[in-house]
Amino acid sequence: SKIPKQNIHFTHAELGPDRASTHYEDVLKSVGDFDIVLLSIGEDGHTASLFPSHFYDENKSVVVECNSPKYPKNRISMSYSRFNQSRYVFKVISGHTKKDAVDLWLKGGSLPIGKINGNFERVYICKDALPLCI
């Protein structure tokens, strides 16, 4: 089945971080909580443009990242608190280059993916992304 267009909510990064975050904040206010969020993890441990060891204002639904260690430098994302209002959070991780990040996360390391759980969380890790210790 097709997902209706009105149920898909993109950020508009081309507006620049300030205007894009204001626009997305308005979008999020109009749609309420998400039923489903699908996430993965980057080789460096980032998730949804939220990076390890970076501070994000949890009083807002949308956060701006102006010093991303990966291109592009400027990004916007939902805050941890906004993600956690979601009903279901699915974490799907694949790729051998993710092994170190997955290992750190599974050992309790402070990574963004561990801070997003929603009301119900499901985790799927493909064999190629699993560390050898498992």
Labelled PLM ranges:
Residues 1-134:
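Conserved phosphate- and dinucleotide-binding cores of soluble alpha/beta proteins
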